[in-house]
């Protein structure tokens, strides 16, 4: 590609082992050339025998970061239906194979060597993209390889790749140790044959005082001769020093690696200390962990001191130890091999000149002077190399290294001393907190002893525990004149009878249980009682209570207040709490006799009957009296409108604040005649299912109708699963639990959690229905049976290359929501290559191919212009009415009556008119 058409401008490579960054510029021929290095050094190059190119050498520790700078022309690729990809291979043959054949988009992207480049929408002239290169897993140590990479443009129309810029490089791992601890044998670590123990014994014996002196330089194995003339002894000494130099180079690299690891540990420790402090503060504010005093008095200050101490240690470790040591290593230790090779070449050159000089028969003009000059030069070179090796093992270099470490440890000692002084300054606060904790432990010990005493009393007490016994009776005085009351409900245990009316206004009645009556005007909210009762399930009524299973009884929290009886289901879980109410106006309560269960009583209202079971006989009587008293007050305050519970009701005192105050009252849909009330309250009508649930003008179903509808829905679900096994599991997450929901416009069967996620996407994306609770049309049912989850997923998940991207049932809602948005909103997994929405949909409707119909609908066909064509293709055959339902659910609207009559038969027009869809609004 020409340079003017190049989309790539430059490439920056960072995270090299020396911390530098190398920049490359895109040339006109499509290759890259090095333009700069942050270290100021030349880039190492390696000759590739395969491609005959010089590759830049990148030394890394764990990974490399590539930053590509593109021009703004890359944003036009999407409009041209082109994709920008990065191809990376370790062999030239694999690299060339991508350009030697045509690959489909799915096959190209599924390759591990291809990375699709997603660029953000931006108006900037230059767009930056980051790619992280890392070696294969398990090959980090001693990993060296050639890498062939390029930026290419893939055309989805003709399935071809066009290369923009190619960049090849050679990577070398510096993370692992290149030498093993056993690389040098013991024979290589001792003196050479020419400097054996016999030579050492010629030295004068050391005095006892000299033996106790400590030296920072170890010279026991090397004797530096005063005469540095070339010879076997000199060469043996050099050979020994060269071996020790290689070992020194190895350990210097290892020391620098350990320093870097310690620095990383310091960074991680500092972050961990700060996060611990933040977490403790959050826990103190959000939970009952009262740590504010500890944080304010000691912990915050101590952790700040600790974090500052670690930060200073890390700073000195890098600036006072690593960088100076690395400079010495780079300047003197790393080029050891180069200096050795240079000396070998110089020695070889000199002795070659010596041979030529001695082979000459006679003295040529100037021959002696030239040789003598070479001899002098070689002597200086030999002396310089000797001094270099001496300094390396017994001179200034060793002194510099020891000085660096001594300076660092002196500074470390100063930091530790300062840290100790600062921690001593906050020690009194810690001691005071310890005293407060001892006092708290003493009070806690007293409380624990009281608990043990109470527990012992409960164990020793015979009979029922106090917590389960009914509360002591408390008298309640009605706060309104009872001589004005006339009871309309004979033969029931109401709170007032004919004898009660003749009594004086200071009449008192005794109600057992937790009942509260406040002074003031007569009002239903003067009666308040709450407690736990067992409620008999409505679907089990009409049978002998002794023969009913325990599952028919449910533990509800019951509250009597404001003239209503409130039932709290799932009262232990405030999140899932359900509340229902029963109006006590014209209600009565009485014991249920001749039943196998104890302590049962019934509540009868003009609308329903309800059966309850108390925990004792006294508790049952208390509830009956409380309900009767509340019913009596409610029945004779008809002129007053009861205050809604959501505005004035008290919460249940024993469960506060678990429940919401927004409750749904029980509606009375029609008036009841006197005979109707009498029939509802008669003993003969007790537990009659038809009397218990009465249908009214509002469309309330009979219980039998509800049961029949529920059974029919279950039959349809079983048929749906037998038709297609994939309908037994959720189409999105694969769950098999509560798979009783569906989306009628996609159409798929879902679990209850994924149905909520579909509902959050909006009805324009997914129209969610319940297979148990909602009424589905016949065509919607046929649609679900004939398509199913498998057919939909073959279209909507065709491009899902990695099955692990699909959520599992145990994943949280955020993961499932993100997948649903990609699948149904973005259509990220649908292959739209070469798809014409209108043509594909029409072909699918005519050939009755579900996959093409779903693909055409996902591609968003033009219903406004071609709606009549689609309608005509479906209405020709009445067996395709379920497909017509699918089109309606996805946006197809009916045309006007004139157009409809031209293409549709009269019978079909009558059918379509029942759909009542909106006509097109033409401008």
Swiss-Prot record:
It comes from Schizosaccharomyces pombe (strain 972 / ATCC 24843) (Fission yeast). The modification Phosphoserine is found at residue 207. CDD domains: ArfGap, BAR_ArfGAP_fungi. Gene3D superfamilies: Arf GTPase activating protein, Arfaptin homology (AH) domain/BAR domain, Pleckstrin-homology domain (PH domain)/Phosphotyrosine-binding domain (PTB). GTPase-activating protein for the ADP ribosylation factor family. GO terms for biological process: intracellular protein transport; retrograde transport, endosome to Golgi. Transmembrane segments: none annotated. This is Probable ribosylation factor GTPase-activating protein cnt6. Residues 444-455 have a biased composition (Basic and acidic residues). One of its GO terms (molecular function) is lipid binding. The gene is cnt6. Residues 714-837 form the Arf-GAP domain. Residues 526-632 form the PH domain. A zinc finger (C4-type) spans 730-754. Residues 444-476 are annotated as: Disordered. The keyword Metal-binding applies. Keywords: Cytoplasm, GTPase activation, Metal-binding, Phosphoprotein, Zinc, Zinc-finger. GO terms for cellular component: cell division site; cell tip; cytosol. It holds the Pfam family ArfGap. It is found in: Cytoplasm; Cell tip. SMART domains: ArfGap, PH.
